[in-house]
Amino acid sequence: PVPLRKIDRKREKNPGWYKGNDILGMMMYTDAFAGTLQGVKEKLDYVKSCGVNYLHMMPLLESPKGRDDGGYAVADFRKVKPELGTIEDLKELTSLCHEQGISCCLDFVMNHTSEDHAWAKAARAGDPQARSRYFFYDNWDIPNKYEETTPQVFPTTAPGNFTWLPDCNQVVMTTFYPYQWDLNYANCMVFNDMVDNMLFLTNCGIDVIRLDAVPYIWKELGTKSRNLPQVHTLVRMMRLVSEIVCPGVLLLGEVVMEPAKVLPYFGSVDKPECHMLYNVTTMASTWNTIATKDVGLLRRQMDQVCALPNEYVFLNYLRCHDDIG
């Protein structure tokens, strides 16, 4: 769209537009904040009056009720939950935000889809091409080998990394919840189609793509299937695509891990990956300081952050929907 190309051109002339300290962000659930996307439009004056110029809308794409993981089990990357509105409503909202100098962020859940996604439904029905988009197995032999080295994300509420599907006599990889099927990025169709979905959202006016659970997107037997080199290759490719197609859009990586594992997601000066990463450690250290009334840990951590190259841009935040740990 022409208005978005104009934004791209403006940001290309000022590539450091997001690196200052003049961006104040707000996270919100559409239904809790204003009921619908139309309701958010009607509250933009209030948002602006708070000094907010960065609006992170929590997951609002179509996902099955009762099996949506807060919207992180996406059934269709090109439809909004009906109770919140439509894709056209989203486009209108982002356009109004841009008129008021507000950038818009949306989660891009790239590790998995809902079991209700069209690909998953076809895979469950036996389509071999659709099954190749996920990790399907006839028995537990290979899944059990994965389990020997792969940590569990939710060992209490969703133990294991695989789920048995009795209706089709198959085992499928489900790192998070049983209704979230992991995508197989070794299949180039998956990468191509998911990047196409990402670009669809940028054409809806999304300025910041939050790459959800990015360390998990590549799996390999005999490893923890976290932070593997192929993950960085995929993120680097996404960065290259975005710089060509939508150069004004930022990639924000969600890497909730210790600092040594977070920094590599910036890439390098000549081969950049994410534009921004969450400053997870500072957030946790801030709450530790409040609880202990001891600034020592926070001071040491901030000294480490300030010693990093200027090219590294962190999104500093106080809290989010995830736990503090």
Task: State where each predicted segment sits.
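Receiver (REC) domain switch/active-site residues of two-component response regulators
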Residues: 207
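Catalytic-core regions of glycoside hydrolase
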Residues: 294-297
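Acidic/aromatic-lined carbohydrate-recognition and catalytic surfaces
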Residues: 1-192, 199, 203, 214-288
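Active-site-proximal substrate-binding groove within the catalytic cores of carbohydrate-active enzymes
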Residues: 301-325
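Generic recognition of flexible, low-complexity loop/linker segments
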Residues: 14, 196-197, 240, 303-305, ...
